[in-house]
Design a protein with these regions (language model features):
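Short Cys/His-rich metal-coordination motifs, predominantly Zn2+-binding knuckles/fingers
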Residues: 1-7, 14, 39-46
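Linear, non-domain "peripheral" regions
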Residues: 7-11, 20-22, 46-50
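Short, recurring structural edge motifs at helix starts
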Residues: 23-27
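Extracytoplasmic soluble-region selector
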Residues: 18, 29-34, 40, 44, ...
Length: 221
């Protein structure tokens, strides 16, 4: 008769074979970075927290605002906030002077009322960090106080172009930017600030906003 025999063999454990740690959730105001790794042999998952939670941050593109009566602007915005944070509320101290309607991402619409005067806008983050911005509403249009981000000197090769991107302060200024070249045969500039090099030589590009002016000297090779 055939004899059936069962043989049992013990295979020694080889241990876990974990993958390298992988970040599955970035560091935020609520927690450090969440990382995990998985064993390729048994599928076991391990999780760990790396680093501390982020410190709340609230930065804006203007420390204060000027507006003409009835003026509306969307130019005021948050320029930096910590990962995981967002704006919880936008509050005006006097809605007869100024109103604000904002979003969690840091953008907003600010509108001046019919009255002149001063008010404050308070921004509160989910992290409870707060910032207050002063707003002044006036009768006159908001005039330019400075023109920035324009190079003093510029060199271009013939037939090449360059786009000027002046930054006007305050951000609520409604005066138009005007561009003028001292020599159209050397360098042209259109109403949007695009310079086109025509032929070799030098010219001056004047950028003006209201009573403020700045000049860029351009050399064409």
């Amino acid at each position: 008769e055939d004899c059936e025999e069962t043989k049992t063999e013990t295979i020694p454990a080889t241990g876990h074979k974990f993958s390298s740690w992988k970040t599955v959730k970035a560091q935020s105001i609520y927690s450090g970075a969440v990382q995990e790794r998985i064993c390729s042999a048994c599928g076991k998952k391990e999780t760990r927290i790396v680093g501390d939670k982020l410190k709340p941050v609230l930065k804006v593109n203007a420390p204060k605002l000027q507006l003409k009566r009835g003026q509306k602007t969307q130019k005021f915005t948050l320029t930096d906030m910590a990962k995981g944070d967002s704006v919880k509320s936008w509050v005006s101290s006097n809605k007869k002077i100024v109103t604000v309607s904002g979003k969690p991402n840091g953008t907003c619409i600010i509108k001046a009322g019919k009255k002149t005067g001063s008010a404050k806008i308070t921004i509160t983050m989910k992290s409870n960090l707060k910032k207050t911005i002063g707003v002044k509403v006036q009768k006159k249009a908001v005039a330019c106080t400075s023109i920035k981000n324009v190079p003093k000197k510029l060199t271009l090769n013939k037939k090449k172009s360059y786009q000027l991107k002046p930054v006007i302060e305050p951000i609520t200024c409604t005066q138009k930017i005007k561009y003028k070249t001292s020599n159209k045969k050397i360098a042209k500039i259109n109403s949007k600030g695009k310079i086109t090099a025509v032929k070799k030589g030098t010219a001056k590009i004047t950028i003006s906003v209201g009573k403020k002016k700045t000049v860029c000297k351009i050399t064409i090779k």
